[in-house]
Amino acid sequence: MNKLNDLRLWWYFFLYTFCISAAIQFILLPYVFSYFHAGNGLLTSSLDSIGFHRIAVDLADKVRLQGWSVYQLRPGGQSPAGIASIFYFFIIPDPRIFIPITSALHASAALILFKFVDLLLKNKAKSILCVLPFLVFPSNLQWTAQWHRDGFTLLGVILILQAMLLLSQLARYKVDRWVFNNFVSVGSFLCGFFLLWLGRPYILKIVSPFVMLLFLLLFIIILIRFFKREMQWKSILLFFVSILSILFIVSKASVFCDYAGFIENVQASEDRKSTITLEDYKKITASIPEDKKSALLIEAHKKITADIPEDKKQTILLEAYKKIAEDVPKEKRWENLKWFPTFIDSNAYSLAQIRSGFRFSGGRSIIDSNIGFGNVVDLLIYLPRAAQIVFLAPFPNQWFDKGSFPANTLMRRISALEMVIIYFFLLFLIYAIWHWRKRIEIWVVSIFCTYIMLVYGLVICNVGSLYRMRYAYIMILVAFGVAGFIMFIERLKMRNMNS
């Protein structure tokens, strides 16, 4: 197993993902679980993928009729639809043609994660075991067996993390192939940033502060090593060129990317379904103040009063709504605190605004919708709760709730098994950090993943969205947790042998 080369391992990862995705889209959905099938291998609950498909078909038809001048990479802000339309134009309008692409993206991400873990374990067989949860968890079928933006995002994040690890190694240790690794790190950043730009551009805005702080730390480490005469000036110069190149990319990304589209991109599909029409909503809520309207609450009371005569229904609905209006989340006016730097205050304000969008979005998996942020201190106070949610949600009392679609209900049951595994290995992540506490890689990975997850925990009140959005980060931590578990077992065996 230790003689297995990276290319062959990538092919194993690819073939596994390809076969599972093909089986789901060509066999299971059409013939076994047809009530989950929306046609063309798409899940009825995968509203994002269905939407991408429809937009792509329309755009491909427009290109045929009017030429490429009407083409858009992001029609309606959706890059997966723009990419799909090209394939639909030249090949066939069927999302199942993307199975090789989604499989390749997932296999590549799994291989790089394998390389991360193998830096510490130095054993390919054990490192493969660590990557298995990332590779095989059923929740990743939302983007491996469906056409979605998350495949691009996942690989983009892992490529950026790979670049940071390479530069951290160059700064901290004596590394072979110094020039090659410098170029690989810059190339990895470029590819990662491009994939994030395609998938979720706002992540670049979140990643940028961490990258800048890390490079400041590496700059200090390099200077210390230089004054100790542990590094030659040529190596330092090349290292600084790499860092400056990446910082240039980061600065440009920060200018052209912002938090716009955060809510639209991560809104959970299960929470977009509503049987009430816009006309019904307007009639029922005609006399309710605009800032107190809630389609989901009104819909609930509409169902309750289904047998009440029409002439009395609206009055009863309005009276019932008055009683629950006090529980509707209220927006908090933002307060600028002078003792915080402007860039911190402005970013905190952006996060508060994004959270507001989730608080009022409704949905069956909404959590803490009554909590909003009025200043930076509010965010800091909520941080422990955000950590609890982002690491541990969905909680056991949510595992057996009913989803908006049968497929979502099934996914909640599956998430219960996944969460048990995640809980177990996160415990050993603590041991892994302690065991490899002198290795810079474990710190870069752990802090980076925790940082991004905390940002998500602060703003995303929808557990369904959060579960999908955090996948890359929490599964990286789980992989290192599995590595910690392996080392813990080996240490116990050695202790028993010695005793």
Task: Write out the residue ranges for each language-model feature.
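Short acidic/glycine- and proline-prone juxtamembrane loop motifs at membrane-interface regions
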Residues: 145-151
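Membrane-interface alpha helices of multi-pass inner-membrane proteins
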Residues: 141-142, 176-207, 212, 243-246
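Transmembrane-helix motifs of polytopic, lipid-linked glycan transferases
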Residues: 84, 100-120, 424-427
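Transmembrane-helix signature of polytopic, membrane-embedded enzymes
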Residues: 96, 113-136
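Short hydrophobic/aromatic helix or loop-helix immediately within or flanking a transmembrane segment
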Residues: 48-93, 199
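Membrane-interface helix-loop-helix junctions at transmembrane boundaries of multi-pass membrane enzymes
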Residues: 119, 173-184, 226-230, 404-405, ...
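Start-transfer (signal-anchor) and selected internal transmembrane alpha helices
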Residues: 1-32, 240, 499
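Hydrophobic, aromatic-rich transmembrane alpha-helices
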Residues: 386, 390-395, 401, 412-439
